[in-house]
């Protein structure tokens, strides 16, 4: 394979992995540890 194709595949895999991790952090098990500043604010 050409070097350019390998670089594109590597960057694509990196982007998909990062997106999956951020979705897991936002909606998965670790989301219970995130704080909500709107919940902490009292009127």
Swiss-Prot record:
Highest taxon of the lineage: Eukaryota
GO BP, sorted A to Z: photosynthesis
Chief site of localization:
plastid
* Coiled-coil portions: none
The record lists the membrane-crossing segments as 4-24
Provide the membrane topology annotation. Single-pass membrane protein
Annotated keywords: Chloroplast, Membrane, Plastid, Thylakoid, Transmembrane, Transmembrane helix
Name of a matching Pfam family: PsbN
- Family listed: Belongs to the PsbN family.
**Functional note:** May play a role in photosystem I and II biogenesis.
This protein is called Protein PsbN
């Amino acid at each position: 394979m050409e070097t350019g194709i390998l670089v594109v595949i590597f960057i694509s895999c990196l982007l998909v992995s990062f997106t999956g991790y951020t979705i897991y952090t936002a909606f998965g098990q670790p989301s219970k540890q995130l704080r909500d500043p709107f919940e902490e604010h009292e009127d």
